[in-house]
Structures are given as C-alpha cells and as structure tokens.
Amino acid sequence: MGKTILVVDDDAMNLRMADVMLKKKGYDVIKAASGQAALTLLQEETVDMILLDVEMPGMSGIETLDVIRTRSELAELPIAFLSASEDMEQAVANGEYAVQGFIRKPFLPQKLYESVDAFFVS
C-alpha cells in the first residue's frame, strides 16, 4: 500500500496538478480545498504527510498548522508548506514554523517528487 498524502490548497488547478503528479509516482492522494476541510478529513483519515498551502481564504495554512500541531496524534506528522513567497521559504528554512519542508509554487513535477520522496526515504 502506498503512502497517503493530504494536499491542501484553495486553488483547484494546484490540487488537480498535485493529485495527478503524486498518483503517477504511486502515492495515494486526499485533497482538501481549505484548512477547515483538511481538519475535518484528518479526523476521518490517516495520512503520512501533508502538503499545505500557506495563503488560503478563511483559515490560512499557518492557522491550520497551529491546530494540527495541538493534536497529539498529529504532532509528528511531516508537513511541507506550499507557497510562491520567498519570504515564507526563508522563514521555513530559519525554523520559524513547525514544518519539515517547503515546496515553491508553481511546482515542477521533478521538484515535487524530490521534495515528497525525501520524506519517505528510510
């Protein structure tokens, strides 16, 4: 059975692209179009990783991350932020957020594969 990745992004095109790319590499993909939808899915589904858009209407990726990290069963779950922001990339590199990675948008297939695969290398 493949690893399951929850992709959270308010942009339908980004969700579709990530879904197609990750499934092509053998990952199972669950999609959520908002932070609140992601939190609901996490009560029902078990995932191995989350790709989380930072800038979303309503509940931002940062707010979603904060809620996820308060749940003991999700505290160690690998999460990578998705963003086009260079400032956010630097903030992640500086350890300002409880995430394990950053993927710059728009993401190219090879970069997405390298970033995600790195989380599952034993």
What are these regions (language model features)?
Residues 16-24:
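Charged docking surfaces used in two-component/phosphorelay signaling
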Residues 11-15:
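Short acidic/polar segment at the start of the alpha1 helix of CheY-like receiver
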Residues 40, 62-75:
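Short amphipathic alpha-helix used as the core "switch/output" element in two-component signaling
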Residues 45-51:
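Active-site beta3 strand of CheY-like receiver
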Residues 56:
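Receiver (REC) domain active-site loop signature in two-component systems and cognate sites
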Residues 63, 86-103, 110, 114:
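Alpha4 helix (beta4-alpha4-beta5 surface) of REC/receiver domains from two-component response regulators
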Residues 31-40, 61:
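Helix N-cap/capping motif at the beta->alpha junctions
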